[in-house]
Amino acid sequence: VKAVGAITLQRILLADDEPDILEISRIALETVGGFEVSVCSSGKKLLERLVEFEPDLVIVDVLMPDMTGPEVFEEIRRRPEFDAIPVIYLTGVIQEEELEGLRDTGVADVILKPFDPMTLADRVNRVWEGNHGR
């Protein structure tokens, strides 16, 4: 459990089709951030796990074989019980116009790959604080 002011952020649901990214990110978020993290290898699995895991924040890769990150984001926003959950994209996109397009979708943050996994918890905290007026 990670306390952020009076807000407690506990659960992060993370989807990426790269096993190494999943493992490194999970370890960093659990050990550095103190979060409970559930990982899955596809967008469809993430959507299936939403109800049972009830995450406080979702991190999703932009390009996965079954669903793109934006498709996952749109589906989360269509569900009233989850439409306020902050979503962070992970992406290998490096062209500025594509990056701006991703940011314009309404996600909380976009993190470029490759990234330093130790900074992931910090970015998650900043997103969480920003969504709660801190």
What spans do the regions from the language model cover?
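Acidic, metal-coordinating helix/loop segments flanking the phosphotransfer/catalytic sites
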Residues: 39-57
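C-terminal output helix
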Residues: 115-124
